């Protein structure tokens, strides 16, 4: 973990650490010592476990999205991991639990219309974990935090030049 003055609050881990700490979620853990010896170790390790869970879901969805587009001969209407559909961590949380974890007929009207081409996945990956129930869901993360763009990024701006500065982590991922 970076030193206190060098941490990127826009990263999933640091965003989660901040929310875990400010909401005093560590006090809800049954055995906090399993996550480390100090408060800082525990905060980091819980945030790391949550971040890994969230990133595993995102990676799976990215692979699913690519397969759907390929199966439907490049039809971009099957894209669902983009900032047109996912503008906040609340939207991402909805995709996890109100879309992928529910059959089409069990989804709410708005969710059904917005994600009508996203299939139901009968997978435990899209069920809340015990740690999420006890601490944070991805929807608890702060949406306004920015992440510095990696200096050797392959991302380009509208002029074809390498992007610099900061951007929203969801835009960065999608």
Language-model features, listed with the residues they occupy:
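Preference for the N-terminal adenyl/adenosyl cofactor-binding alpha/beta module
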Residues: 1-174
